[in-house]
């Protein structure tokens, strides 16, 4: 084009305008009380003593599938009761089978690992069940000593779990159930290779349970490798989209500051 000619866009700017869809809170209330659930009476008593009245949506919709031994993918936001959703049924199953080193829970952060173990202990109060928690920033030597004692549920962050396995202290092939909590964060934090290492080493794995706050297309390939014909549960507030974001056009005249206008 000749010098001095101004380039003009052929894109209609109105295409970028989008009105936000109002966020409507969807309240879910289970038709079942805690006492109605098909779980051990002692578990019910512990849940009621913790203040549980009814299961949350994710707990209500995943309970029977996990009890049946099916692989499961649950999409639900943090704070919806995901920890209880997997702990309640696996604890119920442990009551009848009761072998040590059967359940492996992998979480992205130390804080969540501690929280999961605390929840496990509160649900199993009065039971002869034990847990072990392995996270970074603690003594590896003490972790190795702890593994000499039985633990029905092992909880940990991927880095520490794989470290213990490579040192021969933790045998993944003993575990039959793998639980991946906050799967999206596990991937965001770069633990994909650690997860694949754990999965390949779990040669006797019978059930895989995966919970995530978001569902991304780039996760699907790995999810399909991890889960076999899974039950998929998406709760009412577990879908994250851009529909609630409003987009407008702000016209900036020649010589005007974009930042000044935006501010």
Give residue ranges: language-model regions.
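N-terminal intrinsically disordered, low-complexity tails of helicases
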Residues: 1-70, 108, 250-253, 262
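Well-ordered alpha-helical segments embedded in enzymatic catalytic cores
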Residues: 58-61, 89, 160, 194-197, ...
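Interdomain coupling/hinge region of P-loop NTPase helicase/AAA+ cores
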Residues: 104, 123, 132, 143, ...
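The conserved Walker
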Residues: 76-80
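Conserved beta-strand position immediately N-terminal to the Walker
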Residues: 72-74, 103
């Amino acid at each position: 084009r000749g010098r001095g000619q101004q380039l003009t866009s052929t894109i209609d700017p109105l295409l970028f305008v989008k009105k936000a869809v109002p966020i409507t809170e969807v309240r879910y209330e289970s038709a079942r009380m805690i006492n109605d659930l098909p779980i051990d009476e002692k578990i019910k008593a512990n849940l009621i003593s913790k203040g549980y009245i009814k299961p949350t949506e994710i707990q209500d919709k995943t309970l029977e599938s996990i009890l049946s031994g099916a692989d499961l993918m649950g999409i639900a936001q943090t704070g919806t009761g995901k920890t209880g959703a997997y702990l309640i049924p696996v604890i119920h199953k442990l009551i009848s089978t009761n072998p040590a080193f059967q359940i492996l829970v992998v979480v992205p952060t130390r804080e969540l690992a501690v929280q999961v173990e605390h929840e496990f202990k509160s649900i199993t109060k009065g039971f002869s069940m034990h847990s072990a928690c392995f996270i970074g920033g603690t003594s590896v030597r003490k972790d190795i000593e702890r593994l000499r004692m039985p633990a029905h549920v092992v909880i940990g962050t991927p880095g520490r779990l794989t470290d213990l396995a490579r040192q021969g202290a933790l045998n993944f092939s003993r575990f039959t159930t793998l639980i991946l909590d906050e799967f999206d964060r596990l991937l965001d934090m770069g633990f994909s290779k650690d997860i694949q290492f754990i999965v390949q080493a779990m040669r006797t794995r019978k059930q895989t349970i995966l919970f995530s706050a978001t569902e991304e297309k780039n996760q699907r390939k790995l999810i399909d490798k991890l889960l076999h014909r899974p039950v998929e549960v998406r709760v009412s507030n577990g879908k994250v989209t851009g529909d609630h974001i409003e987009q407008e056009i702000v016209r900036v005249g020649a010589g005007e500051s974009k930042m000044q206008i935006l501010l």
